[in-house]
Amino acid sequence: MNDIMRKLTPALAALLFTVSAAGANAKSQPVPAHDPIVQMVTSLGTVELELFPDKAPVTVKNFLNYVNSGFYNGTIFHRVIPGFMIQGGGFEPGMRLKPTRTPIRNEAGNGLRNTVGTIAMARTSDPNSATSQFFINTADNSFLDHHDDSVEGWGYAVFGKVVKGMGVVRKIEAVPTGTRGPFADVPLRDVVIKKMELAGYR
């Protein structure tokens, strides 16, 4: 099993690459000193996320900007790989890519790890290319952690965790997937983020 995972991990990491889109400006939202709770209502149930602005201030501020603007409402989980992660935050039904704001700095070196239930930013092969797309780890994916400041070792920035609704995450992880155009691992039936909003602080 370990040998199989060692062979698969580089390929799985490559699947977290995102597709670039033109930037669009939006007002920044201040990030409070305590941990925001974001409620994500999906077509398969509700998930609550606790964000860590003390560890990932740039990433949390960026994510909340998208949340507060309603950007995520109506988007889909467009990539689902059992035993790895579920990814969303960039496409509408029909695999229509949404335009995003300017990419942010990668905060993967913040000490947080890609363990089960954590949320992290997806990106292209450029470490500092994350915009709106995120993924929730459904396994302990240590190969996605920051190891060094090289392109290969930079890792994927964790900025929060699931605090309620991990069962919903598992439901999403279990949906049948297939190929849609050039995209693989796409749910055969859309899993829609109906609404994402700031629900309070912890």
Predicted regions located by residue number:
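Bacterial N-terminal signal peptides that target proteins for export
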Residues: 1-12
